[in-house]
């Protein structure tokens, strides 16, 4: 479903824990991390789409979260032609998104990346609110920054920006799809076997992103 300008209606989700840390998911079989997001189906409201995508991508239910804010209007990004499948070029331009800021009121163990037969993520972790966005594919960085900035006014305690490094601190061990910590100590993680060790802001864009279709 595209609008007249070629943008697909979409929702994005910034999920916080009690420490104002943000959920990042590692895309299935890729070394890239992102926030949960997905298209709005015909007949859905943005809120309905948000709850559906939240469950499909994280396993969380409405009772596990509290809505604390949303963007006032659509935030748009265009997808470069080289990432668009040939059959939709000339029609599809990108995404227009309503972003929701959620507070998780459930427990970490409520997160399940295999809630559906077609999971989006195979690992997840919490990171600081203001991490460098190097891990985000370049054409999405501006919309991520806009969403984070607009929604930061809803935080209970303002999250402080940091310019310490090009990569984020890793306050929690990465979790693999079964929800358990990948390792007891960072040094013990075998990055060849556990992809979840790759952090947003590190080398998460080493692989070419998949091409975009209208189903993405």
UniProtKB/Swiss-Prot annotation:
Belongs to the Nudix hydrolase family. RppH subfamily. Coiled coil: none annotated. This is RNA pyrophosphohydrolase. HAMAP family: Nudix_RppH. Transmembrane segments: none annotated. It comes from the Bacteria. InterPro entries: Nudix_hydrolase, NUDIX_hydrolase-like_dom_sf, NUDIX_hydrolase_CS, NUDIX_hydrolase_dom, RppH. Residues 159-191 are annotated as: Disordered. Its EC number is 3.6.1.-. Accelerates the degradation of transcripts by removing pyrophosphate from the 5'-end of triphosphorylated RNA, leading to a more labile monophosphorylated state that can stimulate subsequent ribonuclease cleavage. Keywords: Hydrolase. It comes from Burkholderia pseudomallei (strain 668). Residues 6-149 form the Nudix hydrolase domain. The keyword Hydrolase applies. PANTHER family: ADP-RIBOSE PYROPHOSPHATASE, DIHYDRONEOPTERIN TRIPHOSPHATE DIPHOSPHATASE.
